[in-house]
Design a protein with these regions (language model features):
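Extracellular/periplasmic carbohydrate-active domains that bind, remodel
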Residues: 1-238
């Protein structure tokens, strides 16, 4: 196939009539785009039907779904349905992985010990981490000794460990768009990850879900059939 500047689903056999299952064509298009560093662009107001699947479609390049519509049909996926040992209701349609995997940064124990010796972190005064990273970094802070609770409503529970994610620049300065939400009496753990340098843009598209109608117990009825993002520096435009 002659190398093109963009890829569309019809190049790989998609019908786009809202009836034919276009899952395999969509997967093939993205795999080709990923391999060749090409954007995926939908042409016109096509409707793509997506049925059950056992693995997500990977996205590594820019996508413009434009006026296209995607029908994600869960109506035939029972809560406990499996294929090849995989629970079908838990398979995302699209997945945006981090190129080369997630790069974790080590060596922050000294800073953590210093912070704890000084009484922790105050959300009103914390502006900088005294570490020279050399590049922007995503930090995840934990206080395993403190729990935050949702006490009322359908999401009420037994609490979760206090944690949040912030971004600092190459010199350790806190990004004003990611201020601390909580005070930390103690930082028990800190994970640091390199931020993906190359930006990625996902835009356009209308998504419709046909749900599976069931009277099964509530804990069986959570479906994860959408788009999962596991990298940073991604812009979503509706």
């Amino acid at each position: 196939m002659e190398l093109k500047k963009t890829v569309c689903y019809e190049d790989f056999g998609a019908v786009g009539d809202g009836v034919a299952n276009d899952c395999n064509a969509i997967r093939a298009a993205h795999e080709y785009a990923n391999e060749n560093g090409l954007d995926v662009v939908c042409q016109g107001a096509k409707t793509y039907y997506i049925g059950p699947m056992t693995k997500a479609i990977p996205i590594l390049t820019n996508v413009n779904w434009g006026d296209a519509t995607f029908i994600i049909d869960d109506s035939g996926i029972a809560p406990l349905a499996t294929a090849d040992g995989i629970t079908l209701r838990s398979v995302q349609v699209f997945n945006i992985p981090s190129p080369g995997g997630i790069s974790k940064i080590e060596g922050l124990d000294e800073w953590k010990e210093k912070v704890n010796a000084e009484g922790g972190l105050n959300r009103d005064t914390f502006k900088k981490i005294d570490v020279d990273f050399g590049e922007p970094v995503l930090l995840r802070l934990y206080n395993d000794g403190h729990k935050n609770y949702i006490r009322y409503g359908v999401n009420a529970g037994t609490g979760g460990i206090q944690q949040e994610t912030i971004v600092v620049d190459k010199d350790g300065n806190l990004d004003p768009n990611t201020p601390l939400m909580y005070d930390y009496e103690k930082v028990t753990r800190i994970d640091a990850y390199k931020i993906n340098v190359e930006p990625l843009t996902i835009e356009g598209g209308t998504f419709i879900t046909y749900p599976f109608l069931t009277n099964e117990p509530q804990h069986y009825t959570s479906y994860a059939r959408g788009l999962a993002c596991h990298r940073s520096n991604v812009t979503f435009k509706i």
